[in-house]
Amino acid sequence: MKNKTDITPDIKADTSARRDRGESTTLMEPLLIGEGSRHRTALTDLALELAQRTAGFRRSLPESLLTSLAGLVRAMNCYYSNLIEGHDTHPVDIERALKNDYSKDAWKRDLQLEAKAHITVQEWIDGGGLKGRALTGNGIREIHRRFCDLLPEDLLWVQDPETKERVKVVPGELRPRDVKVGGHVAVSPGAIPRFLARFEEVYSHLSRTDAILGAAAAHHRLAWIHPFLDGNGRVARLMSHVMLLETLDTGAVWSVARGFARNVDAYKSHLADCDSPRRNDLDGRGMLSEEALARFANFFLSMCIDQVTFMEGLMQPDKLRTRILSWVEEEIKLGALPAKSGNILEAILYRGELPRADAATAVGATDRHARRIVSALTERGVLTADGARAPLRLVFPATLASRWMPGLFPERVAPGARRGLELTFPAPDARYVFDREVVVFWGQDGETRIRCEISEEALDDHFDGDRKNELKAFLAHQHEIEEIARRKYMAGRLERDGSVSIQTNEL
């Protein structure tokens, strides 16, 4: 499951038999930062702060918004967890994969399938599929099996850097050979079940505070056991996700993986440091360094608090309302949404959901006009409902995250783009504007959003539009059209309002 051009597999050496060398499970002690530890007070304070902030954030969200936000956070969690492994699949492409819209490039398609697998597993977890079993040997194996079962064949192979032997990863199978990860030689293959049994024994029956602290400790200790040939990092992060979900009732609306990925060097350094042996008489009583484990727990909990704080800021009602309604007004001016579309979204933001019968009242118009607005917003991907008569709920699409939820994940920029000196196209956001007979799409120059458009005539004459489906013609030739817009922009050939317009007589 590594990048084809940069394979850094876990395996270092092979053993012919899956034997147990009899290592004592005390090798991975301490498994917890105990009550008597000099590090405990500071960590307990962080655990309590995390619990309070998580509860407050969850209470601030209507249940319907909680569900919608959790869907976007799954894509975010998947993006950042895979990014830590060197796999960069933007959430916009992840969202496309969930609609079975895959890249023609084989490697990008494989990464989309990998992302879809991750989201499928997390959705199963968020739905309670692993409740009470996340820390059991069988539960950990099931995470791995479900994830790897959905991976394309090319992502199920790792290569020994010394022998060049290619070894296939079997979904859910415990590691059959010895491995070395950095400077750490993992326990023998036959010993893995014993270590997982001890892991379950310690982490499955903890008080709430210990369970919060244990989420950090267990994250490293599972990586230390290294139960699988590959995929251990993602399994550990999914396990941490479910531990926090169950212990803190997070609602799955924030992701510690985002914090790890944004501080990836520190994350990996802390994990490596936790492999260190006990340093002196002040460093606990286990075989491994208690101080290193405490520092990682501090980092882990601080990242959690940081991510809750970040999501709280994004979801502040007044600010979220302003960003969404600003986007709606822009769409209305472009003719892409009907007038008063903002009334529907504002009502949902205030109430959490909107019964269909109340839509006409919300917009102050006829039922027919209200249905037209609802249809347009649904087609745009920002409204959903569980059925034809069910209440309307908000959706947070990845394509609009940069407008609605800025900073949630990075903009998708073209390779070699220079901020402030280049027009890039971070996310697909195109629509046909009937009254102007143009397809409008958006570029980005640094922090500035640049409106671009191509005429229906240009699409018909040069891009197989044929006056049938202009948006479909645009999407079929999107990269070519974006490159034309980029060249015009860089040459300074702009309209008076700073936009880029592509006409047939220029092509």
Residue locations for each model-derived region?
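Short, charged/polar N-terminal "headpieces" of proteins
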Residues: 420-443
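Short alpha-helix boundary/capping segments
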Residues: 110, 451, 466-469, 473
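A short, structured beta-strand/loop element
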Residues: 437-463
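Short, surface-exposed linear segments at secondary-structure transitions and domain or protein termini
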Residues: 264, 459-468
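Short, ordered beta-strand-loop transition motifs
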Residues: 386-388, 431-436, 494-495
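Acidic, low-complexity intrinsically disordered segments
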Residues: 469-507
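FIC/Doc superfamily catalytic core
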Residues: 1-419
